[in-house]
Amino acid sequence: MKESTEEGKAFENASAEYVKDTSNHVRSNEWEKMAAMTRGENYVEPEKPKAFERIDKVNYYLGIAKAVSERGTCLRRKFGAVIVKNDRIVSTGYVGAPRGRKNCSDLGYCFRMEHNIPSGCMYEKCRSVHAEMNAIISADKEELEGAVLYLVGVENDGSITKKADCCAMCKRMIINAGIRIVVVKTPDSYKAINVDDWVVNDDSLELHEGY
């Protein structure tokens, strides 16, 4: 017992500059650990420093597009768009009626919903201008050429729209605007679309996709 006590004191003396007289120590090296153990104290491994986390640029702009969507007035779902060129935001857009006209949120009803019109069909019956369109008309032509458009759709329950896509009308405007890439948020990640693919696949402009 005497030898054990002397050994314990030796460990304490060797690590005296680190060890504090408390009942539960957090140590940073083996000397501290052994000294605590010889005194019958609990040793708690120090937490490893967490790696610095920084959101990537794509999700950064998608996050902004999601925030923009909160201004939307559509009763079905909200969409937000952000156009970026040379790492600079050119313009933003959300779903809403033309200036001076009442929004669906003001009227309290959506004609397309009341008549069970599916997404991607009969947009002439919709009061609103789409997010992509509003973003495009808010930017100068020079700023649109070669730009990237970020798009996020949000359902009424707050979840990300599962199969979000630009409608045929918005695709035509995006092509003519000279936008190079469209990035669409998905529930788990995002998808990047080369706008040239819409030009090559001409039938894509006739599909019933969109809001």
Which stretches of residues belong to each language-model region?
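Short intrinsically disordered terminal tails
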Residues: 1-4, 24, 210-211
